[in-house]
């Protein structure tokens, strides 16, 4: 039965709070995936022929809680980044929808309170917003990566900031906090654009049509399953396409004295020359699959459900 209650659109504060909460929970829960992925991708300097593996990296850990090393910068980066990303993305998509006069012609999805856009609009919005947020959060991204690696033994955020600031050829330069920016954006921008494109397509078309075969009435209860399923599929597709830039980004942010220089081209050549060849560009892909898929399912599910939470909206008004 259709409700006569007028729809209350989520405000900017709600988007920021929902996005930050979703990012915080997913980042802390899935930190072990990030730590192991970083260690698989880092250069094995002690033995050129040595090839690391998940089991070998797990055996190196002295305590179970070491899997959460780097959790503080990771949660800071993801909660702040997710809050900004979801907020700016929502505002951008709403603006584009209004600009194209589609708000009346294209109603909201039954499983979402977000505006519906064309495939190109979704791709462009995700790409541009991720570029902005990625640049803003780049310093904390480098701190996070170095905390996760066993190449650096930082014991505090202060040590991490100081170590990066005084590191490499650019000693005492703020540029050190933006190493690997191009590689990171080359990974994150296409990923975000493709993710939003795949997510909206899956959420509004493929997944609902699949689920309706099993349940034609419980729309509200199914919304969580629809959003989570769409998020996992979208994340898997986008992750595979952008995997090489993830390996390049990690190596750039960890190695201060890379042979041949610190550039995307030089690092790519170095990765290809190392034992494993082209496969090195996809090292850690299985962990990134798991991390990104679960993170997307958790983040977007929590985000969209919080947006639809009447109680939370009332608290903010």
From Swiss-Prot:
Subcellular location per UniProt equals:
Mitochondrion inner membrane
**PROSITE patterns to which the protein is assigned, alphabetical:** SOLCAR (PS50920)
The record's Pfam families line, in alphabetical order, gives: Mito_carr (PF00153)
Instruction: Please list every transmembrane segment annotated in the UniProt record, as residue ranges.
Output: 16-41, 70-96, 123-148, 180-203, 226-252, 284-302
SUPFAM superfamilies, per database record: Mitochondrial carrier
Q: Name one GO cellular component term.
A: mitochondrial inner membrane
Question: Which GO molecular function entries does the Swiss-Prot or TrEMBL record give?
Answer: glycine transmembrane transporter activity
InterPro entries this protein is in? Hem25/SLC25A38 (IPR030847), Mitochondrial_sb/sol_carrier (IPR018108), Mt_carrier_dom_sf (IPR023395)
| Keyword flag Transport | yes
Q: How does it sit in the membrane?
A: Multi-pass membrane protein
What UniProt keywords are attached to this protein's entry? Membrane, Mitochondrion, Mitochondrion inner membrane, Repeat, Transmembrane, Transmembrane helix, Transport
Domain of life here? Eukaryota
Q: Which GO terms describe its biological process?
A: glycine import into mitochondrion
Q: What is its main location?
A: mitochondrion
| Solcar repeat windows | 10-95, 117-205, 222-309
Name the catalysed reactions: glycine(in) = glycine(out)
Q: Which HAMAP family does this UniProt record tie to the protein?
A: SLC25A38
Similarity comment: family membership: Belongs to the mitochondrial carrier (TC 2.A.29) family. SLC25A38 subfamily.
Q: What does this protein do?
A: Mitochondrial glycine transporter that imports glycine into the mitochondrial matrix. Plays an important role in providing glycine for the first enzymatic step in heme biosynthesis, the condensation of glycine with succinyl-CoA to produce 5-aminolevulinate (ALA) in the mitochondrial matrix.
Instruction: Please identify the protein, giving its name as recorded.
Output: Mitochondrial glycine transporter
Q: Which organism is it from?
A: Meyerozyma guilliermondii (strain ATCC 6260 / CBS 566 / DSM 6381 / JCM 1539 / NBRC 10279 / NRRL Y-324)
